[in-house]
Amino acid sequence: MTGAGTPSQGKKNTTTHVKCRRCGEKSYHTKKKVCSSCGFGKSAKRRDYEWSSKTGDN
């Protein structure tokens, strides 16, 4: 029976996110080919949500 303890943490040594070509953040997923910050690879438009800014901010 394998657990999620200390021995399993040693397997987490692969690079998941690299620098994005569009926004420059370290959020581009190398396997999914999508940036979690700006949405590059998924959409031509920038990733933006209503909850990401305060109400009344323009």
Curated annotation (Swiss-Prot):
Q: Does the keyword Lipid metabolism apply?
A: no
PROSITE patterns in UniProt: RIBOSOMAL_L37E
Q: Say yes or no: keyword Metal-binding present.
A: yes
Cellular component terms per the entry's GO annotation = cytosolic large ribosomal subunit
Per the record, the zinc finger regions (C4-type) lie at 20-38
Molecular function per GO: rRNA binding; structural constituent of ribosome; zinc ion binding
- Listed InterPro entries: Ribosomal_eL37 (IPR001569), Ribosomal_eL37/eL43 (IPR011331), Ribosomal_eL37_CS (IPR018267), Ribosomal_zn-bd (IPR011332)
Q: Where does Zn(2+) bind?
A: C20, C23, C35, C38
Q: Which GO terms describe its biological process?
A: translation
Q: How is the cofactor bound?
A: Binds 1 zinc ion per subunit.
Which Pfam families does UniProt cross-reference here? Answer: Ribosomal_L37e
According to its UniProt record, which protein family does this protein belong to? Belongs to the eukaryotic ribosomal protein eL37 family.
Q: What is this protein called?
A: Large ribosomal subunit protein eL37
Q: What is the lineage of its organism?
A: Archaea, Methanobacteriati, Methanobacteriota, Stenosarchaea group, Halobacteria
